[in-house]
Curated annotation (Swiss-Prot):
The lineage of its organism: Bacteria, Pseudomonadati, Pseudomonadota, Gammaproteobacteria, Chromatiales. It is an enzyme of class 2 (transferase). Belongs to the spermidine/spermine synthase family. GO terms for molecular function: spermidine synthase activity. Catalyzes the irreversible transfer of a propylamine group from the amino donor S-adenosylmethioninamine (decarboxy-AdoMet) to putrescine (1,4-diaminobutane) to yield spermidine. HAMAP family: Spermidine_synth. It comes from Nitrosococcus oceani (strain ATCC 19707 / BCRC 17464 / JCM 30415 / NCIMB 11848 / C-107). This is Polyamine aminopropyltransferase. It catalyses: S-adenosyl 3-(methylsulfanyl)propylamine + putrescine = S-methyl-5'-thioadenosine + spermidine + H(+). Homodimer or homotetramer. Spermidine binds at H67, D91, D161, S162, T163, D164.
Amino acid sequence: MQLDPKGWFTEVCKEGGLAFSLAIREKLHAETTPYQYIEIYQTETFGRLMVIDGFIMLSGRDNFFYHEMMAHPVLFTHPHPQRVLIIGGGDCGTLREVLKHDVVEKVQQVEIDERVTRLAEKYFPELCQSNDDPRAHFHFGDGLRFVAEAPANSVDVIIIDSTDPIGSAEGLFQASFYADCQRLLGEKGILVHQSESPLIHLDLLNKMRAEMKKGGFPQVRTLTYPQCVYPSGWWSATLAGHTLSCFRERDATAKIFPTRYYNVDIHRASLAVPEFLRQTEESS
């Protein structure tokens, strides 16, 4: 969580007993918002880097893993995802991926800190290229309140593209929030939530899955994918719904939009459960 004199940014993951470093060319921006401290760097090999409160949020080089896996698996699992709600996602990369789906008619994005979006527009314009799409609707405010006050059965898919479960994001990982999401979705809706590293944050992942079930989602499945700049380099997202077996494989195979990581084989492979995860799921 520091830029040392030799020009390296290092994020220390204390719970994992590890650190990740990137060589920095220059610091482009830093500011304190009402919610957090945001820094933008130009790295030597990973493009631009966004850091929030000392934690890496995204890099220009590898963000496509995260954004594609937060969007396409859930959208190709829902039978007809017309109405999408994104909680968080201020860098707009997930929004860009969602809007690649022609079936989507409306996307609402609720980000608590507008400055994240404005800085993404300036320093990561490639992620924000769909922000002017008429299907995109931006709300800057509390995602918990938005979900609690939204009408029942008003969305088909909820994507929770949140930071780690600390501070203002902590409530997004609790059963009461998932219950509100379930009310918005109804029986056919599906939720996906970024769920940290299964290697380092296994206790959190298991608790999160349990909270989803307490919130009214009978089926829960976790998918995994590489993410170099996050702790351990291995990340996950967890799907929740009443049924998660409707993979529209034919549509995914015939997709006409470009992706850099996601395809049908990746979709299937990401849902394969490593044995240590299977054992913890069976015992929970």
